[in-house]
Amino acid sequence: MLVDILRIIFIVGGLTFVFMLVQACWQKRCNGTLESTPFWPVALIGGVANFLDTLGVGSFAVKTACYKQFKLIDDRVLPGTLNGQCVLPTVTQSLIFIGAVAVEPLTLISMMIAAAAGAAWGARHVASFDRQTIRLVMAISLLVVAGLIFAGLLGLFPVGGDAMGLGGYKLAIALLGNFIFGVLMNVGIGLFAPCMTLVYLLGMNPLAAFPIMMGSTAVLSVFSAGTFIRKGAFDAKAVLAVAIFGPIGVVLAAMLVKSMDMEMLKWLVAFIVIYTSWTMYASWRAARRSPVQLAVERAG
């Protein structure tokens, strides 16, 4: 019953987004402001990125790197474009994993609500955040966590478990963590890897992370993308391309995850955490070097 209700919520949210996107694309076309973004390169990048996203590797970092490398998307509309592109893929992810992985209802629903509340609070206070400090702290924290996970896999440290739900102080920690991750999504830090790490460290089955993190992101993305669409701060053609081809990558990856051995999945989690730590550090380093390079260029 609960699974059916959640699926209806996700479907309604997805259809609402589709209506808003089609309406916005039509208006831009009528006004002559529809972007000239190349459709197929963006669609291919979106399909691959969302394949990786379903495995737990956040798609934001992959897509941002590709868009900047090939100069496909204007930086001014990049945040809105990324948020819009993730709606239908995350809705697809949620529809697949909500029913396939039996997470304890209280844990699933409460963590989704916590993430949504964090995103709502963060949207009002995001301007006061120091993104550089957040990136560096997250990079170091995830690196430490990766070390703990590897130690557990090698039998040096007890970590992970088989639980499909949380209670007591562990649930409280999970709710606080997901609230914070929801806040951080407003500064471009994806929820997937931190949520997966938290769930694993609290003793849950790694597979339980998938419906939790995907359900949380699906709820958030519908609201955040709607805001960007209303403001017109997005690339309509790029969003449309990934809205079509992103879910295809999701379905292919979901088939792989479902058939994956649990021990292999634990190793995948560890490598995803290390990768995310590196991308956080790389973003911090790039943003730190930019003002210095600009000063050197001006002096030259």
Task: Give the location of each predicted region.
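Hydrophobic, membrane-facing alpha-helical anchors
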Residues: 33-34, 57-66, 88-92, 161-172, ...
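Transmembrane helix-bundle signature of multi-pass membrane transporters/permeases
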Residues: 79-87, 210-218, 243-247
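Paired intracellular helix-loop junctions of major facilitator superfamily
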Residues: 72-75, 228-229, 262
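Interfacial segments of multi-pass membrane proteins
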Residues: 63-77, 193-208
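Membrane-helix boundary/interface segments in integral membrane proteins
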Residues: 198, 222-229
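Juxtamembrane transmembrane-helix boundary motif
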Residues: 1-49, 98-186, 200-201, 206, ...
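Juxtamembrane transmembrane-helix termini in multi-pass membrane transport proteins
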Residues: 52, 58-103
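Short helix-coil transition sites and intra-membrane helix breaks within transmembrane domains
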Residues: 50-60, 182-192
